[in-house]
Amino acid sequence: MGRREEMIAKIKELMTQPERIRNMGIAAHIDHGKTTLSDNLLAGAGMISEELAGKQLVLDFDEQEQARGITINAANVSMVHTYEGKEYLINLIDTPGHVDFGGDVTRAMRAIDGAIIVVDAVEGVMPQTETVLRQALREYVKPVLFINKVDRLIKELKLGPNEILNRFAKIITDVNRLIKRYAPEEFKNQWLVKVEDGSVAFGSAYYNWALSVPYMKRTGVTFKDIVELTNAGDLKTLRQKAPLHVVVLDMVVRHLPNPLEAQKYRIPHLWRGDINSDVGQAMINCDPKGKMVMVVTKIILDKHAGEVATGRVWSGTVKTGQEVYLINSKRKARIQQVGIYMGPERVNMEAVQAGNIVAVTGLRDAMAGETVSVEQIEPFEALHYTSEPVVTVAIEAKNVKDLPKLIEALRQLAKEDPTLHVKIDEETGQHLLSGMGELHLEVKLYRLKTEWKLDVDVSPPIVVYRESVTKQSPIVEGKSPNKHNRFYITVEPLPDAIYEAIREGEIPEGRPKDPKAVAKKLAELGLDYEIAKGIVDVYNGNIFLDNTKGIQYLNEVMDLLVDGFHQAMDEGPLAKEPVMKVMVRLHDAKIHEDNVHRGPAQIYPAIRTAIHCAMMKAGPVLYEPYQKVIINIPYEYMGSVSREINQRRGQLIDMRQEGEVMIIISEAPVAEMFGFAGALRGATSGKALWSTEHAGFKRVPNELAVNIIRQIRQRKGLDPNPPKEQDVCPQQ
């Protein structure tokens, strides 16, 4: 039996013992060494050869990832580790640290129960560290900490043991501050990471060594030994004395929960159904004999097998030939192949039971986030993404005969990555692709060329703006075209606290399942409870409230009013850009008794025009997306980089020096950031390391707004002059 077969046999045996399984991920800020850590863990567990690890970046198996040196797709690998004489199955999901791929991180978090948070010892906790940790804690994923690149503190910064320990203490304090802030109430203290119990390890993923207090106690290796061996350059002895995979995987087995433990507290939070039902109990108990339920976390296209859906099995057993329901898409499907991952390689199995990560084919048209079950059940909570698409490009096929293929390719990309928004316009042949940033879109366009062999024309990137209001409007009347229906509404700015709660997922988007609970939450955040009681719908960071009393036939048209509200929010009055942070209130209505006279053709224009007219009376403004830009540069380039940021309407937020390196944190409008990579390379002779993350929206300065509105309107084929109130409000 070869090594590979032996490994598969072991994995098969352990898959049926949930107490021996750990589903875990590794998450970090970009370039903090996440993929190098993953690869050396795999090498240690015998999945790839040690010579290749760290150079090969085995999890970066997309050729583009290898070229860019950043992880783009969350890949999954199963491996075996022995701890205190027992074998454990560890399913490792590698996630990207680059903000443009934040959606992948969110989806991976749904599948795992624990995460190693990697922090660079030199840079410390960075903005993206906070983002990934917040995502983990929101999904009830327990963290442990690995402090990486300790060799740089010894060799480059020449710190002594005490200074190094002070550095560790600061990082641990920073991480614990975030855990206290973002962890679920019941785990705020329980999940804090501590050096003493081994929930913190430190080392160098690149040089393949690590230490933790339990390991030091067990083996007698001291930190002093490490400093001496590093300074002497004796890396071989270092690796033998303190092997990375042993220390880190021991920490994983000891501190991260198995599926039996984790599902007890994760299922009530992640699933909206009745916990006391048979299927609810089967998931809470991770029961392989229960009804099969899995959640798809990723879709990839395999040249031979077609669409492969990776996901977490919460209850029951996934088997070949099983007939299943795709709950969100309201469709049936039949599972064709069932398997697990070992790196990019998929190994087929007859069945995979609850508590494992599975790869299946046959779920055509499933999207990431889909709930799959053998019977119709409540779906899992919608996955919550931290960023929103802010950059758009228009794409056209150069060759008309490629049009059907392009549409198919765009649909496929959207299915694999729900953070990518695709708008297909079959009439004009011009399709819009919106993503989290320039890099996100570049990667997708590259795939159109290489995987789909498509030749496309791409417009320069366009920024997605938002429209909003600055004050409360008077009551505005909206009349239906036949004059038989009238709606009286106001709009006003949505308070910041409520907008943030919607963005954070504390107030769910959509029609509330439990309006009383949502009204209570709105009241806690400062809205008058009498007004909040009228909550009807939450849509893209806007809310619609019904504050009428006893209006006849209102319930019959409420669905149409909500649709009309969506239309008004999708395209605001200034430049047909999406609307954000607006509260729309319905105060009164007169509705025709005969439903022939109150159909969509009457209700939509009435409510849409009323909302837009009210917005024009409420001080309409334009918001633009901002990015936080984190740049590491040698000290001498400080001046040229500051100039580069200032020229782009950017602001410096923070600066700190670490040895020879300056870390600059700034914010700048996305519109000014195109081509920044090249300019920065030029300004620093290629010596800058940088990353970005979404920093929300800010109001466009008045002196720029008129021009921007003109440009957007012109691009959309509208009259370029910004509309005035009388252009939008119907003359009475």
Swiss-Prot record:
Domain of life: Archaea
In-chain residues carrying the UniProt-annotated modification Diphthamide: 597
Keyword line: Cytoplasm, Elongation factor, GTP-binding, Nucleotide-binding, Protein biosynthesis
Keyword Isomerase: no
Residues that coordinate or bind GTP: 28-35, 94-98, 148-151
Main localization category: cytoplasm
Protein localization: Cytoplasm
Role, per record: Catalyzes the GTP-dependent ribosomal translocation step during translation elongation. During this step, the ribosome changes from the pre-translocational (PRE) to the post-translocational (POST) state as the newly formed A-site-bound peptidyl-tRNA and P-site-bound deacylated tRNA move to the P and E sites, respectively. Catalyzes the coordinated movement of the two tRNA molecules, the mRNA and conformational changes in the ribosome.
Protein name listed in UniProt: Elongation factor 2
Upper lineage: Archaea, Methanobacteriati, Methanobacteriota, Thermococci, Thermococcales
